[in-house]
Amino acid sequence: MKTTAEIRQSFLDFFHSKGHQVVESSSLVPENDPTLLFTNAGMNQFKDVFLGMDKRPYSRATTAQRCVRAGGKHNDLENVGYTARHHTFFEMLGNFSFGDYFKQDAINFAWEYLTSPQWLGLPKEKLWVTVYETDDEAYNIWNKEVGVPAERIIRIGDNKSAPYASDNFWAMGDTGPCGPCTEIFYDHGDHIWGGPPGSPEEDGDRYIEIWNVVFMQFNRLADGTMEKLPRPSVDTGMGLERISAVLQHVNSNYEIDIFKTLIAKTAEIVGATDLTNKSLRVIADHIRSCAYLIADGVIPSNEGRGYVLRRIIRRAVRHGHLLGAKESFFYKLVPTLIDVMAEAGKDVKAKQTNVEKLLRLEEEQFARTLERGLSLLDEALSQVKDGILSGEVAFKLYDTYGFPLDLTADVCRERNITIDEQAFDREMEAQRTRAQAASQFGVDYNSIIRVDGETKFEGYTEVESQAKITALFYDGKSVESIEAGQSAVVILENTPFYAESGGQIGDSGYLSAQGVTFNVKDTQKYGQVFGHIGELTQGSLKVGQSVNAIVDAKRRHNTSLNHSATHLLHAALRQILGLHVVQKGSLVSDKALRFDFAQPEAITKEQLTQIETLVNQKIRANFPVQTDIMDIDSAKAKGAMALFGEKYGDKVRVLTMGDFSIELCGGIHAKRTGDIGLFKIITENAVAAGIRRIEAITGQNAIDWLHNQQRILTQSADLLKSDVNTLVEKIQQLQDKTKKVEKELQGLKEKAAMQAGSDFVKSAVKINGVSVITQQLDGIETKSLRVMVDDLKNQLGSGVIAFASILDEKVNLVVGVTNDLTAKIKAGELVNLMAQQVGGKGGGRPDMAMAGGSQPENVAQAIKVAQDWLNKNL
């Protein structure tokens, strides 16, 4: 029996033997594709190739692509663990043809791999196929060439209520590449309920789809017209877990070797004995998606991809607690996961320490969140009047505190309270709508600027070149010429202008000819060509014309210094903070650099100083900035890091700075690190959960910044009649003096307030024989208010005191109740009622409670509410 790892390798070996380039799985975070939440299909990394915007040095490819479906249209999360085949994480085996072979070879390759004794050796009589209703070509290949009997070939028409809306017709979007597909099904046998595809019983588990072969042969226009593509392509996908279940003779994916091992390990860790428990399935599935998402740079957070990751982790942890887990357990599955994934586990193994750390921290945080959620639930239940907890509160517990609905229901049942689940479902649906990420490529394929060929980039060595115009675009449309005053995009055959990429801004400058000036404001890539974006201020330009392309050399130079400094900063961060630091984004301009990176903890001032010092040491070392072109495997073997947001071909540009930094980079750089001159960090802060940002400047900009800081220091010293060297000491003296004066003033205020205590006793109001004092005393701290309340309680003997004070734009509330009245009047209940009026909350003992608030303008209302409540309850 083949293991899952052996099946994965045999698939790649088979297609390699058929002339396919074996391409590594891409990240679960799609590169430069904001339309996708996660990589969810094998073709995602080849999207631009299919669109004609990218070229590869091969026309046939095969991959074992890791995928996640837990958001947007492809959302399997709620079914995971409860069905035989739903997963958040799965591997998609695929073979691809980019204008090379088409239907005949694609179908024959699939049949050979599935049925040949040399490969999988599946019984031919167990295989059924579907084709699009009008795809006679595919039908005839299956029937006449391959030999599949007509009774096992099913034509599927437009079964989704629209033209070309069919299980057997695939489209990239509303417009663009599309075409029919053929699907291969495996018949598990009549001992399992279900019917063949297209039948009323097709949702059963007898006939399982194992392979989908898509034939991209049309381009759909905006008006619905289908035009044939000049170079049709093939995109296929086969779920590794599904084919493993078939070959390992089991009916559920959770019974294959990978899941059996993960389930057994989970049971061992949490102390479970029933290996069929669905919670074990949930955890075994979720450790795969969570570990790979973190390895690919996703960090748990409250938005976007991080929010989906957090939901998956918490769902797994919750199921662990259902199984009886008493301590953190989820992260302990990572070593087992790495082992069972074999070669496909290397990316997690490389980040194992960070993966385990983040999983453990998130699980521990969830435990604390559960406690806070219980407190909120207790408070909400105390206010329920009609025996029903609102669905909005239940959803807040779920969404904000990660509180499972069934746990909320258990607590409610103990108090004979039910939940308005319909309202909860409405809130959940509204949240799904807000968070849903479109799974289609939300662009009009036909509106993209597309130009055949490519622009030769000469900017590594030149800032000025003669070049021929190959295309012009005005108002998004291709034109033959433009006139003065028009803004346009100019495509050149060759150019010294750098197009924005890898965080580095595009070059600016101008294009000139006799009597012609085109100001270039930005440079962007459109597929393989460079677009010079700007305005023609003089003359006219036409396709085929030669121009002199001149880059703004000063702006380019300053940008190059900042880009090289970014590499030094990245290396310094990894050396000072740890190898878990990876780039999450950057912006390199001529004025400054911005660098976002993964870092779960705050950076201390000492660490920040160490980082800045280390970068400046490497600048003074004056390392040569060396570039080498090599294949991707050699670059990785050399230890080169890939930069976030960049795409790399088989040949890559490796940038080395001494023995300190080595990265893959296509950007413009300084010749030596010494050219940077000076590196100065301006700000450092968190921009998202687990993501921090450093902004810095270099060269003359850094020197100018230091001069300005010196000027500010000198002016400050002059104002304080000090000098720069003793400025801190002088400020400290002033602060000490100010604190002393403020303390004396506060003491005088408190003394005056205490002296007024006897007046408060005299002015106490009697409510049903109980003495009540409600007063606003501004400028008094909470501590002093407490002392006053205690003193007045003693003077009254029996009574209620409620004080409000405004201090530094904030509200302090203190309520005291003598012991003889606490059965009827509770200080905590009254102070919370007052706090609600001033935007705050609080609590305490029945005889003494405090609260704070942020709305001083509502203090009078808080006093009135207290008086009304006491009138009602005494």
Curated annotation (Swiss-Prot):
Top-rank lineage group of the source organism: Bacteria
Major localization class: cytoplasm
Reactions this protein catalyses: tRNA(Ala) + L-alanine + ATP = L-alanyl-tRNA(Ala) + AMP + diphosphate
Residues reported in the UniProt entry to bind Zn(2+): H563, H567, C665, H669
GO biological process: alanyl-tRNA aminoacylation; negative regulation of DNA-templated transcription
InterPro entries reported in the protein's UniProt record: aa-tRNA-synth_II/BPL/LPL, Ala-tRNA-lgiase_IIc, Ala-tRNA-ligase_IIc_anticod-bd, Ala-tRNA-synth_IIc_core, Ala-tRNA-synth_IIc_N, Ala-tRNA_ligase, Ala_tRNA_ligase_euk/bac, DHHA1_dom
Cofactor: Zn(2+)
Function, as annotated: Catalyzes the attachment of alanine to tRNA(Ala) in a two-step reaction: alanine is first activated by ATP to form Ala-AMP and then transferred to the acceptor end of tRNA(Ala). Also edits incorrectly charged Ser-tRNA(Ala) and Gly-tRNA(Ala) via its editing domain.
Similarity comment text for this entry: Belongs to the class-II aminoacyl-tRNA synthetase family.
Identification of the protein by name: Alanine--tRNA ligase
Taxonomic lineage from the root: Bacteria, Pseudomonadati, Pseudomonadota, Gammaproteobacteria, Pasteurellales
